[in-house]
A protein has these predicted regions:
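Conserved small/polar residues in nucleotide/adenosyl-binding loops
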Residues: 2-9, 354-360
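Beta-rich carbohydrate-recognition and catalytic domains
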Residues: 8-240, 244-293, 298-351
Length: 360
């Protein structure tokens, strides 16, 4: 039977980082961070047992002047805590003002964005403002595999050279920070201030609910809305994608009801109070796998003065070759309901099957 051991270390005089030694083959340990004896956050990391593959930093700046306790539970089978103390990680677990993030990887992409360290996938909440592109993304800062979902953050003036920033939104008591989208609230509809950046994302804990965070400094730091969740459904749903609909004068949000094989459409005057207007997808298109990461957009019809609405639905798995894919539906949208032009049994795939996959 697996038994957890608990090791505590109290830090008062903080340096910039706590460096965590990682071994890829080790089981996950749980690190609970307590601030002034109250739970602040929790994450999993594969703390080194036999050898150290690399170090990852835990940023401490936000805790300066506070008493921080790290409550670490290892995942190994032990007979007593002394066995856990022999693990390789304890020799190199240390405080530091520096972290070596030099890129020594020969095969790291040059033009494609990658984080300085850690694991990433879905791009989230992208926006352009004041001459800069902002990219948020699903990010695990504590290992090279999926887990500990945060919103990482980078910015660029040319979409080639990227400046990396601290994590924008991190998990809290409502759960991990899954995919979502963001908008520039030019008219202060939410009441947080003109040109505030509003992010809506899925909080994934015991259930999947939708949360809001806002930024008053062009997306560099976010404040989590105190009245979250803003949408709580009785079924699994995720990946909110929102936009302003001029004709109805409301914000529209599309939410993937993953296991129902549907997209739910909501409207709001203020980004905080949402009304479910309709659903689309039951019996339509590819019904295999999980529906997720939707998008709904109005596009011009080539050679005419008309427009059509396109609803993009990512699935995983269920693609033509068995893996992930993106399907799309063409139709009309009146601010409440999406009406598809084609019959339910017709499935339209994006040209490369995956190039639109899991974007927000």
């Amino acid at each position: 039977r697996q038994r957890q051991m608990c090791i505590r270390d109290r830090v008062q005089e903080l340096q910039k980082y706590l460096l965590l030694p990682v071994e890829e083959a080790a089981p996950e340990a749980t690190v609970n961070v307590l601030v002034n004896n109250k739970a602040d956050q929790s994450f999993q990391v594969r703390l080194a047992v036999n050898r150290i593959d690399y170090l990852v930093p835990f940023a401490l700046d936000q805790y300066r002047g506070k008493t921080v306790t790290f409550d670490i539970h290892t995942g190994n089978s032990r007979t007593n805590v002394r066995d856990a103390m022999a693990d390789a990680c304890w020799k190199e677990l240390k405080l530091s003002d520096t972290f070596d993030d030099a890129n020594r990887e020969v095969f790291r992409p040059f033009y494609h964005h990658t984080p300085v360290y850690g694991w990433m996938n879905d791009p989230n909440g992208m926006f352009y403002k004041d001459g800069e592109y902002h990219l948020y993304y699903q990010y695990n800062p504590y290992g090279s595999m999926w887990g500990n979902m945060n919103w990482g953050h980078s910015s660029s003036k040319d979409l080639i050279s990227w400046q990396h920033h601290p994590v924008a939104i991190q998990p809290n008591g409502l759960g991990a920070v899954f995919s979502g989208s963001s908008v520039v609230d030019k008219d202060n509809t939410a009441g947080f201030g003109k040109d505030a950046i509003i992010a809506i994302y899925t909080s994934a804990g015991a259930s999947q609910i939708q949360s809001l965070a806002y930024s008053l400094d062009n997306g560099m730091t976010f404040h989590v809305y105190e009245n979250n969740p803003i949408i709580a459904a009785d079924k699994e749903c995720r990946d909110p994608n929102m936009f302003w609909h001029e004709k109805s004068g409301k914000w529209i949000l599309v939410l993937a009801a993953a296991l129902e094989k549907e997209m739910w459409i909501y409207s709001s005057p203020d980004l905080k109070n949402w009304t479910k207007e309709s659903s689309f997808g039951h019996g339509y298109g590819a019904q295999e796998g999980v529906w997720e990461c939707p998008d709904l957009m109005e596009l011009p019809v080539r050679g005419t003065d008309r427009t059509k609405w396109v609803l993009i639905c990512n699935i995983n798995p269920g693609g033509p070759f068995g893996g992930s894919a993106a399907q799309y539906f063409v139709g009309d949208f009146d601010g409440k309901t999406f009406t598809c032009d084609t019959k339910p049994e017709v499935t339209k795939w994006t040209v490369s099957y995956t190039h639109l996959r899991a974007h927000e």
